Amino acid sequence: MIVFRRFPTCLLHHIRQPASRSLLLESQRRSLSFTSYKYNSSHIDDDKSKKKLKNVFQMNSNRVIRKQKTKEELAKERFEEQLRSPNRFVRWGAIARSEKFSKGMTKYMIGAYVIFLIYGLFFTKKLFAKDKELERLLKKQEEGNANEYEALRIKELKGKLRRRDELKLEEYKKMQEEGIENFDDIRVQNFDQNKLNEQILPARDTTNFYQEKANEYDKAINMEERVIFLGKRRKWLMKHCQGDVLEVSCGTGRNIKYLDMSRINSITFLDSSENMMEITHKKFREKFPKYKKVAFVVGKAENLVDLAEKGKPSLENEKENQVKYDTIVEAFGLCSHEDPVKALNNFGKLLKPDGRIILLEHGRGQYDFINKILDNRAERRLNTWGCRWNLDLGEVLDDSDLELVEEKRTHLGTTWCIVAKRKGDVKKKDELGFVEKYLQSSIRKRMESFEKKDDMASKKELEPVPPVSKS
């Protein structure tokens, strides 16, 4: 009898699939062997890297590894290098940025301020003393009691000494050193540069010269004026024109393009050359064809007063018989006049009260080397342009009856920009300088207040003390 036993299902599953199990075991074995290989190989790589690092460390055992510096440390090193720099300006710059210098700067500032105050005090006292001396001398001059030395001293205090005045003042100072103090009856010889300088040629009548030069004058002079930017100066000259205007030595009318007719009531042109006056007339009519209050007169500046009176009805009062102008202008005319001082005096006679004379001229410069050049080329200049460009215009102005309001010089002092008035006329507000307008008056008032306080204090000290009553 055959007996069949029932096996469990799980056991039958394993018996029936022997191949699949063997495959599973094989895959597990391979996985384990691969892991072992990776582990072993990683150990091998670690050993190689360790050996390599060991070799590198042995090679670089003498090299010093430094810590990376901060910005502050780098800036400090750079500052120390600048302090040791061979360039002095670099060293000074580093010192100025140092902490020690910054701390001491306050002391320097305080010291500088104290020095400034002390200097300002002495300067103010000196300025006040000069102002008081000038006031005293001017008062004496108005009374007609000032001698020649005092007149020169007035010019020196005003800063208006000419070369001949400097030479005269030197003679008076020599007398002072010898012990002479009273100069009332003493007069020093004149050192007129316009007469003593042989390079300054004598004046002559230039009418015929400019008659022949008229047609080519503008073309010949254009380049010279452009090089020295003379148009700017001509513009300055004509901007002063207002009211009734007279232009003397108008030439070919080179100033017409700078006229502002909205500020002008009437205008008169004067020149000794008829040919030049025709060119002026043509230029004016081209620019202002409808303007009616204009006159073109041919004549000399030395005969200006006679020309103004010509054709006028005679009146009992001669002054009312003359034509008067608010503004008289002239550009480069004094150097061509036969008598420049007389011409200036004529300007003053035809000027209205509070009127102004505006001059643009050339003459001697402010430096000796430029004056030597002018002297050496004086004859050539006279023959080419008909002018004496090395005249000392300061002497000419001082010898006239005019009083200077403004004097500016350019081109090394050879170009003179002058504003003048009649003697006795008061300066306008806009003609007062900053020092004259604000500083001198305030300093005078301040110092006078100090003097009053000192006088009051001295009077109190001199007053008798009342006796104390005994009770």
Swiss-Prot record:
Mitochondrial intermembrane topological segments: 124-471
GO terms (BP aspect): methylation
Localization in the cell: Mitochondrion inner membrane
Single GO term (MF): methyltransferase activity
Biased composition (Basic and acidic residues): 450-463
SUPFAM superfamilies referenced in this protein's UniProt entry, alphabetically: S-adenosyl-L-methionine-dependent methyltransferases
Family: Belongs to the methyltransferase superfamily. METL family.
Name of this protein: Methyltransferase OMS1, mitochondrial
Highest classification ranks of the organism: Eukaryota, Fungi, Dikarya, Ascomycota, Saccharomycotina
